[in-house]
Design a protein with these regions (language model features):
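Residue-level recognition of tetratricopeptide repeat
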Residues: 32, 73, 104-107
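Terminal, low-structured helical/coil segments at or just beyond the last alpha-helical repeat
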Residues: 114-165
Length: 165
């Protein structure tokens, strides 16, 4: 996936899934490929299935917030703002993950409020501090087109949502 050959990566993960039936991580990677390929409806179906299967399973507790965040973004792309809000409805500033901050930032970006979105991201950086913790969340916003990559590539986002400029 890192080399942006999504078709090849998707084929590889589908093959892996044949050998590792129902494997959560393989299924997550398939949903992720659909997400970065802007197949948001397909990704959402896969992500919601992961959430259902992960519910109550302590092995996946750490992944649930990121899966919810990606689901929230899919809902925004599909113009279901109320549905998107549901994914952060049970979170607050005491949450163990950045979902509260990044979810609210995404909602602000979606509403065209870039300055407010940046405030939410700054709060997340202050609260969580560790770039490794925030990396997947930041990468997700980059893939979605709300923020620019540190490595350039801005011009590739022409078909993505507005970046607030």
């Amino acid at each position: 996936v890192e080399f942006r050959n999504f078709d090849k990566a998707l084929d590889a993960f589908k093959t892996a899934l044949e050998f590792q039936k129902g494997d959560f991580n393989v299924r997550f990677n398939i949903a992720e490929i659909k997400f970065v390929s802007q197949k948001y409806q397909e990704s959402l179906v896969d992500l919601e299935s992961l959430l259902k299967d992960a519910s109550g399973n302590s092995n996946y507790t750490g992944m649930i917030p990121l899966v919810k965040f990606k689901s929230l973004l899919c809902k925004l792309k599909l113009k279901d703002v109320d549905g998107a809000k549901e994914y952060i409805g049970d979170s607050d500033f005491l949450s163990d993950s950045p979902i509260y901050y990044y979810g609210n930032a995404a909602l602000e970006y979606n509403s065209g409020n870039s300055a407010e979105a940046e405030k939410w991201l700054a709060r997340a950086r202050r609260v969580f501090g560790n770039p490794q913790t925030l990396g997947p969340w930041q990468d997700t916003l980059i893939e979605f087109g709300y923020i620019k990559s540190f490595y350039g590539g801005d011009l590739e986002l022409e078909s993505g949502p507005p970046t607030g400029e």
